[in-house]
């Protein structure tokens, strides 16, 4: 996958070595760890120089599994020959993923943990991934589908047929992305390969992809995707996808399900998207006592997977360049007050989004969701969570949450778990970004939402609300600096009353996510949540825990 590099919008935040230790040892505490075992086992002497491709990752927890390490960045160097070498992310900070580097290593494990994460004494960038790859043919993304039984599983597979997977891509996923991109993204299955027994397990996903790619003669490149369907009984994660930089990046995926939302979500990662998550604050839209929950945007395909495959929201569409300038109106904190009419996002005409940029350059998006076209389920019995039509407010961000849904009708922390209402109230001024903007929804009709926005330019720069601590599926909250506090297991969320509604489930039983108790949630922005798994950026991987109609789906 050399030749691909992350865009500035996909930059990763720094992270501590506690994360690296957890991923190296995580196989003892989770059902499966997707980080290649060779990374954790790398053994290089102090002072050695390793030359290879830099790979960067973001760790996330398996659902319902508490007691791992913080979310954060992983980095390793892949030499041309031999095992990858896990290194301290701080030593390669600012180096784009995919670059060719020469890294001089320090002594083993700065805290003596023996985790294999090595300090970096010096880093030299020998070459960057080319950002000038030739684009594929217009509106063409070629998909190679292969059915795979990882080592140790039944070589005959799990009963899923090649035809089912091909149909999922061509009949459901391809039309979805063609619709979302107004025809700019066209997925087509160009090669198919029936069940084959792999020589490696899912614990080494890179090697699994490489093994199958060699067998089917798949050549990576722009607009080329390798989609593996792997046996459900092989102990693999629910799904895994490389994170690209654009819809033309191509990339590799494996899935254990043929659901539309699951496969469409994974292609979204290949195209360059992170997750659509949600932030909840105690009685406020932003600021104060808050939490951010991974995947909790049920409106959006990049949120949790369930029976509805939601429209790509404005923040995610803009990230891919799929929201035309003519369909968005821009306003900065230094601008003048405006009143605009937002047309339904699903209608794909008119002004579909307002983009607000605060004093620090943070971008917020307003969009109008109605029960029309792809969002028609909002007015049907399929709307299991009672999601509302109305104006939604999101904050754009970097990986892993490239979109964060804000709660326009916030409740007290005690009611967070059962609160799925997020639309802005009509006739009520809502403060955005610590007062940089005041937003009022003046009225709603099926044809549009009238929205007034008044900027408040601060004299000495903005003071936006700090991002809330991010809470993935499962985990405990730890301090963001200093030594880890005593771990506190969190309660589960009550299951929605409708049978089959997706939940943030545990690894072996249908339960809610292990969220931090509202009474114990961390104030401010200095908390991290434990995690294991991997989100790899650029020419790397993304692991997402997803659920389908109430049954466990983990990856």
Q: Model-flagged regions — what are they?
A:
Residues 43-75:
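Structural detector for short beta-strands of small beta-barrel domains
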Residues 90-93, 250-251, 346-513, 532, ...:
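Non-catalytic C-terminal accessory/binding modules of secreted extracellular proteins
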Residues 83-84, 90-102, 106-262, 271-283, ...:
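Propeptide-to-catalytic entry region of secreted or membrane-anchored zinc metalloproteases
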Residues 220, 225, 232-377:
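Extracellular hydrolytic enzyme modules, especially secreted metalloproteases
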Residues 2-42, 527-548:
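Secretory targeting and sorting signals
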Residues 507-525:
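Short, aromatic-rich amphipathic segments at membrane interfaces
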Residues 64-68, 134-136, 291-292, 378-385:
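Short consensus segments that form the blades of beta-propeller domains
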Residues 62-63, 151-160, 309-314, 373-377:
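Short, solvent-exposed loop/turn elements at domain surfaces
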């Amino acid at each position: 996958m050399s030749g691909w590099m992350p865009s500035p919008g996909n930059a990763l935040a720094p992270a501590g070595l506690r994360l690296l230790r957890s991923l190296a040892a995580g196989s003892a505490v989770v059902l499966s760890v997707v980080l290649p075992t060779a990374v954790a086992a790398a053994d290089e002497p102090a002072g050695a120089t390793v030359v290879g491709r830099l790979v960067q990752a973001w760790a996330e927890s398996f659902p319902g599994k508490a007691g791992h390490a913080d979310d954060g960045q992983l980095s390793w160097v892949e030499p041309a020959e031999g095992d990858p070498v896990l290194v301290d992310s701080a030593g390669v900070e600012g180096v784009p993923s995919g670059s060719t580097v020469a890294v001089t290593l320090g002594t083993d494990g700065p805290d003596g943990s023996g985790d294999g994460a090595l300090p970096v004494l010096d880093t030299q960038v020998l070459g960057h991934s080319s950002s000038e790859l030739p684009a594929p043919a217009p509106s063409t993304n070629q998909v190679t589908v292969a059915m795979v039984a990882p080592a140790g599983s039944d070589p005959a597979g799990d009963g899923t047929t090649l035809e089912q997977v091909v149909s999922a891509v061509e009949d459901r996923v391809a039309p979805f992305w063609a619709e979302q991109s107004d025809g700019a993204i066209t997925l087509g299955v160009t090669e198919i390969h029936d069940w084959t027994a792999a020589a490696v397990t899912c614990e080494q996903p890179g090697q699994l992809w490489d093994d199958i790619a060699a067998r089917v003669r798949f050549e990576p490149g722009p607009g080329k995707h390798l989609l593996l369907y792997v046996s459900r009984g092989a102990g693999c994660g629910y799904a895994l996808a490389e994170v690209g930089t654009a819809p033309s990046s191509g990339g590799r995926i494996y899935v254990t399900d043929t659901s539309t939302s699951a496969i469409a979500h994974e292609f979204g990662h290949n195209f360059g998207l992170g997750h659509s998550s949600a932030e909840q604050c105690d009685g406020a839209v932003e600021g104060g006592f808050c939490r951010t929950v991974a995947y909790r945007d049920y409106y959006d395909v990049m949120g949790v997977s369930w029976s509805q495959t939601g429209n790509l929201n404005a923040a995610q569409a803009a990230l891919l360049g799929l929201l035309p300038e003519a369909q968005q109106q821009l306003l900065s904190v230094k601008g003048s007050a405006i009143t605009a009419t937002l047309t339904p996002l699903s209608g794909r005409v008119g002004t579909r989004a307002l983009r607000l940029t605060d004093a620090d350059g943070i971008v917020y998006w307003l969009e109008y969701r109605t029960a029309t076209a792809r969002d028609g389920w909002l007015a049907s019995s399929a709307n299991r969570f009672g999601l509302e039509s109305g104006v939604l407010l999101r904050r754009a961000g970097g990986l892993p949450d490239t979109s964060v849904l804000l709660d326009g009708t916030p409740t007290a922390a005690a009611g967070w778990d059962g609160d799925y209402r997020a639309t802005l109230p009509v006739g009520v001024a809502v403060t955005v970004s610590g007062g940089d903007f005041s937003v009022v929804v003046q009225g709603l009709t099926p044809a549009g939402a009238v929205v007034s926005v008044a900027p408040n330019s601060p004299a000495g720069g903005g003071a936006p609300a700090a991002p809330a601590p991010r809470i993935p599926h499962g985990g405990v909250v730890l301090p963001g600096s200093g030594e880890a506090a005593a771990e506190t297991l969190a309660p589960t969320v009550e299951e929605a009353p409708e049978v089959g509604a997706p939940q943030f489930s545990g690894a072996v039983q249908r339960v809610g996510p292990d969220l931090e108790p509202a009474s114990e949630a961390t104030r401010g922005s200095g908390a991290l949540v434990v995690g294991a798994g991997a989100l790899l950026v650029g020419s790397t991987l993304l692991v997402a825990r997803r659920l389908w109609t109430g049954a466990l789906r983990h990856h």
